[in-house]
Amino acid sequence: EFMVLARFLDQAGRDKSAPLAGPSTLSQLSGFFGYNNFLPNDAPNGNAEQPAAPVTLPISQILGLPNDLRGGVTGPCPYLPVKPELLKRWQDALSEFSKPWIGIAWNEAQPGLTLDTLLPAIRSLPGTLVSTVWDHSRRQLSGHQGIIDAGAHIKRLDDLAALLHALDFVVGPDGIILHGAGAAGTPGLVIAQYMSPWYWYAETDRSLWYPSMDVLKAPR
């Protein structure tokens, strides 16, 4: 959800010193976007530290407005921060492999989308498959040849952001990788649940919030 919100923060008329409140798990991500005044609302007495807020409207409720009232989404995109030196490092590292460079992501276990479930649908694609997974889910790569294990070199969000900017396409389930690809303006396909969250709302299969992303919903 924060990755969607980050697209519009600069348009709120406040500088990056403005406080942001939310779960403590988002503190690193908010800092990545340059908002370092983060107030965790799930910490002891966390709510007491938060400034009084005016009338609020959750972004998800915007989708309930009529189209002519809601209007279009006009926030800037791409907006995922990237360090040029890291982007060049990924581009140089991948340059020996055929394009397009297709980033892939998967879930840790079923009933999520595992690598074994995803691969039959993408093996015939041209170019090079590049794993973007950096946690223990990388173990699913064992026994699969021909996939570049870029995740082994991802140590922080800066590395992931630069990789997502370097790739030509990204495919996988709902998660930070697909949100990041959308924020980077990288074309991609998210494989979402049939009753997908509001942030994967799509009109004619194209994501409302991430213009470069298509949304494929699982059957009922």
Q: Model segments located where?
A:
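Catalytic machinery of carbohydrate-active enzymes
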Residues: 1-220
